[in-house]
């Protein structure tokens, strides 16, 4: 993975601003290939450049730069303060529209003057958020470009690479500072285009192509681009695992890498951790959720999980037999006789002093104490992914210290909810071994260069993109300020630029699309001709060899008296599984 540009004119004193973090990595690899051990220029993605430049020109600023998650929290508070019931989808849309307003230089007064009810409401939220930042003496990343424009010192001109179209904010800033463009070498105008009957056929063919190519040329870097990687992730992973025989191989050792992170809260390890914190709070308040209790005591991550595995499973059956959503500790205690180690853990947690309302940083200390008391992640050796997740949790949970600066005291249950919300905003992907086969989305693939490349899913749902105007910005204002996908002219230009970037992923790029996806009909992108239809041979399915055992004869039963059958049936009926 490289960028297709000549870096001979750059020196260690230069700075380079790239469109995204993956291009930053590709730039460093390209520099090492072209310039060897020469000192590397400073390289930044766009937001990193803003933060680094602001800190350089304001080293002693009294204002604190808040993170994106802190910013979301303050926006949420502003919306709630103005009477809005906030959910995650609404907050995501509001944050996206605020980013549009800053990037495309839309003033809140324009929205107020539009006389659209949604726009007026959104403008009120934005103004309240701005006032909140002034009160707290903080900044977010959207404030930095204006501060840099009003600087009192000179800034060296950066090189730019990988930007399809500069936003008005970026254009204004770089016009003020001055810049040079690091041009990409994009000579290709043609590609090999193929059609398949189903997406399964398409993915299977591409996986086979990648495997064969890798076996013949293991040194080649191969890119497989899927515009719908989020929705097709599991299908792609399943088929590639079958083709590469990687079903039982851990993430870090697979022959390929899928570049798709998930929110921390989507990982079972983190869900177990949060359940432990919830149960700790419930034990202290003496109102225990059956669902949470059963999830925690059967967790493989708490202390002595392997030693008491069977007896804890039986305890789950006992708790389920009560048919209660919640229960108290005195109801549970008589049944802990067969799980003495678990009994000691529960008594240790429940006997701790009950904390009332505290600041978030104090709750973080309490949470760490709970995890230590439960012996979380100590009963067995963690896998590589689990180890990375635990480290990421420990780093991310420090965000509660930041919440303590902008929030009042909260209850234990609210602190757990806030921690869960914070973790859900952090996208995590475990580091894997270096592999030459990369499966990635179209946005992060643009601007990169590989030895071989294949782009899946070239349907009319992908290129050109559908009209998608912002929810809180009127259509005329969105089109006037050139917000992406807000009118057909912008969509057509973006589609042309995207196709040009994808065609130049390699010297020879394959494009393909499938006629059907899970029984839904699909149509090709009108930007490319598809005349070569591939008939994918049916995948051979051979039944597994079965070993037959002659069980018509057996040893005679010595003791024909049967007892305890009622108890066995009772246990089976009580079992949830």
Locate each region found by the language model.
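Alpha-helix C-terminal capping segments
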Residues: 4-11, 76-79, 104-111, 144-152, ...
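Basic/charged alpha-beta structural segments of nucleotide/phosphate-handling enzymes
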Residues: 10, 21-154, 168, 311-327
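Conserved RecA-like helicase ATPase core segment
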Residues: 125-126, 130, 155-202, 208-211
């Amino acid at each position: 993975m490289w960028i297709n540009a000549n870096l001979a004119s750059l020196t260690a004193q230069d700075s380079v601003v790239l469109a995204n973090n993956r291009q930053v990595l590709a730039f460093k690899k390209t520099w090492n290939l072209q310039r060897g051990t020469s000192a590397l220029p400073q390289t930044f993605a766009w937001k990193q450049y803003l933060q680094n430049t602001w800190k350089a020109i304001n080293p002693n600023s009294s204002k604190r730069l808040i993170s994106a998650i802190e910013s979301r929290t303050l926006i949420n508070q502003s919306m709630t303060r103005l009477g809005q019931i906030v959910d995650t989808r609404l907050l995501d849309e509001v944050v996206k529209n605020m980013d549009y307003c800053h990037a495309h230089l839309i003033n809140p007064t324009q929205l107020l003057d539009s006389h659209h009810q949604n726009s007026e409401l959104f403008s009120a939220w934005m103004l309240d958020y701005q006032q909140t930042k002034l009160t707290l003496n903080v900044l977010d990343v959207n404030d930095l470009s204006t501060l840099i424009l009003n600087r009192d010192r000179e800034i060296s001109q950066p090189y730019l690479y990988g930007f399809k179209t500069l936003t008005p904010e970026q254009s204004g800033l770089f016009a003020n500072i001055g810049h040079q463009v690091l041009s990409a070498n994009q000579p290709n105008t043609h590609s090999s285009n193929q059609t398949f009957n189903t997406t399964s056929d398409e993915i299977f063919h591409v996986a086979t192509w990648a495997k064969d190519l890798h076996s013949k040329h293991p040194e080649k870097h191969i890119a497989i681009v899927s515009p719908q990687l989020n929705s097709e992730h599991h299908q792609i992973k399943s088929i590639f695992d079958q083709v590469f025989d990687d079903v039982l191989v851990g993430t870090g050792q697979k022959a390929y890498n899928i570049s798709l992170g998930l929110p921390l809260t989507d990982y079972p390890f983190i869900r177990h951790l949060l359940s432990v914190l919830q149960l700790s709070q419930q034990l202290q308040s003496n109102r225990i959720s059956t669902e949470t209790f059963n999830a925690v005591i059967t967790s493989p991550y708490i202390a002595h999980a392997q030693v008491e595995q069977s007896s804890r499973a039986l305890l789950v059956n006992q708790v389920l037999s009560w048919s209660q959503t919640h229960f108290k500790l005195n109801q549970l205690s008589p049944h802990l006789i067969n799980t003495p180690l678990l009994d000691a853990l529960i008594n240790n947690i429940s006997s701790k002093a009950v904390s009332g309302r505290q600041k978030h940083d104090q709750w973080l200390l309490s949470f760490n104490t709970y995890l230590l008391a439960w012996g979380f992640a100590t009963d067995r050796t963690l896998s590589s992914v689990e180890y990375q997740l635990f480290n990421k949790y420990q780093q991310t949970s420090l965000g509660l210290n930041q919440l303590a600066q902008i929030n009042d005291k909260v209850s234990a249950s609210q602190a757990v909810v806030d921690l869960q919300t914070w973790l859900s905003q952090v996208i995590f992907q475990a580091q894997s071994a270096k592999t030459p086969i990369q499966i990635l989305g179209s946005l992060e693939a643009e601007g990169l260069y590989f030895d071989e490349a294949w782009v899946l899913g070239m349907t009319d749902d992908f290129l050109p993109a559908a009209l998608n105007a912002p929810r809180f910005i009127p259509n005329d204002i969105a089109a006037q300020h050139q917000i992406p996908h807000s009118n057909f002219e912008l969509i057509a230009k973006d589609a042309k630029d995207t196709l040009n970037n994808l065609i130049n992923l390699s010297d020879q790029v394959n494009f393909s699309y499938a006629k059907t996806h899970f029984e839904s009909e699909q149509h090709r992108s009108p930007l490319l001709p598809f005349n070569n239809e591939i008939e994918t041979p049916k995948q051979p399915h051979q039944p597994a060899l079965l070993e037959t055992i002659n069980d018509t004869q057996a040893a005679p039963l010595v003791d024909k008296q049967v007892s305890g059958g009622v108890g066995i049936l009772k246990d089976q009926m009580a079992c949830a599984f």
